[in-house]
Amino acid sequence: MKYQAKNTALSQATDCIVLGVYENNKFSKSFNEIDQLTQGYLNDLVKSGELTGKLAQTVLLRDLQGLSAKRLLIVGCGKKGELTERQYKQIIQAVLKTLKETNTREVISYLTEIELKDRDLYWNIRFAIETIEHTNYQFDHFKSQKAETSVLESFIFNTDCAQAQQAISHANAISSGIKAARDIANMPPNICNPAYLAEQAKNLAENSTALSLKVVDEEEMAKLGMNAYLAVSKGSENRAYMSVLTFNNAPDKNAKPIVLVGKGLTFDAGGISLKPAADMDEMKYDMCGAASVFGTMKTIAQLNLPLNVIGVLAGCENLPDGNAYRPGDILTTMNGLTVEVLNTDAEGRLVLCDTLTYVERFEPELVIDVATLTGACVVALGQHNSGLVSTDNNLANALLQAATETTDKAWRLPLSEEYQEQLKSPFADLANIGGRWGGAITAGAFLSNFTKKYRWAHLDIAGTAWLQGANKGATGRPVSLLTQFLINQVK
């Protein structure tokens, strides 16, 4: 899809003009101009009750005298001054549905005139593009009959302000990164294993002059003492690989990097602590943290942000066999702390703890890890907010700000010292689980023991990384949040 921002005349020929209208006869400048061009036709529709402005209601008009456009699509925007982000998304999706049904190839949108609460034109355009790209996404790689795709080729926003051009640039890059994250996450686990994840990182680095790649294999992990990471991998024939993508683009090449760490369990059966069979297929999504870091690295390379950023994809697979690690095992982690394994299905934190120690070598400005870590986070926050745990208030607030700006929502959970009590073991420095209560928090508390040398935040995306039911599939979250956070570091 090609997106443009430019001033257009209402008399310009096009497949379709999209126009927003509020309830209670609150009309925009363009509405009144079109009404004049069509000799009062739009006001006649209002008087007859056919055009109410009700939220996401669409009225499609064809071949209107006075307009060169083939069609005029009017969409209801609810009450003026009360339009929320969620309602705006409904409007965009309603418009997109009609455009697809009418095989529209080019559209000129006057939705730039819509007023959103606490949002500017930049946000209006960027969010519209991200919504369009997200809604149009199809994953039919393995279907013999491909899904019908939209023929829409050109989407023109009626404005020529500089904000609009930046919004298009950001939205295109972020949408590309989200798509990349969704594509990898939706791949079946018989194809997307740790080696596949490393191969995708290699392809990304080879296609970008700004990115370089180092892959750490099991032999190197063993030399480094990454015993917790390796223990998780022991039950699988697919070997573990940790892919380290480096984006070195700050004016000062020696500036401390921001490090993103993504949990990459390409399939998690739970190991010896085997998961229930129901919905186990969804455990291919246990690598969505790595997928989101991959998508974010792709995005920032496309945007050419003047930052130094390192993205680590911690690829691994957790399966049961005669060589698998067991409940009761005690592991010596890379930083020397010992961990008693009480549940082999609490494996993500074991992979992450060694990865978080590994990244100390980069002397990072800060580290953010992203993981589908706990079902407890889904119980606590549902599927709308990612869980945020951090030892640094400024970092946590910056991530929450980015979440608000993008509507890629997050909610901060507490991390007081009392939660460490639940992780005590009579036989080791730590237990890998902290009991039934506060599971999302105790998982974060566990990780905090391996982050003493830098500013750190943890995003638990177990509830937000994928959807179930009819719309089953990866969401690409939190690529938008992470990218916005990085954009804000430049400002």
Swiss-Prot record:
The active site is at residues 275, 349. The keyword Hydrolase applies. Mn(2+) 1 binds at residues 268, 345, 347. Mn(2+) 2 binds at residues 263, 268, 286, 347. Its main location: cytoplasm. PROSITE patterns: CYTOSOL_AP. The keyword Metal-binding applies. GO terms for biological process: proteolysis. Its cofactor is Mn(2+). Its EC number is 3.4.11.1, 3.4.11.10. CDD domains: Peptidase_M17 (cd00433). GO terms for molecular function: aminopeptidase activity; manganese ion binding; metalloaminopeptidase activity. It holds the Pfam family Peptidase_M17. GO terms for cellular component: cytoplasm. Keywords: Aminopeptidase, Cytoplasm, Hydrolase, Manganese, Metal-binding, Protease. It is found in: Cytoplasm. Binds 2 manganese ions per subunit. SUPFAM superfamilies: Macro domain-like, Zn-dependent exopeptidases. It comes from the Bacteria. Presumably involved in the processing and regular turnover of intracellular proteins. Catalyzes the removal of unsubstituted N-terminal amino acids from various peptides. Belongs to the peptidase M17 family. This is Cytosol aminopeptidase. It comes from Haemophilus influenzae (strain ATCC 51907 / DSM 11121 / KW20 / Rd). The gene is pepA.
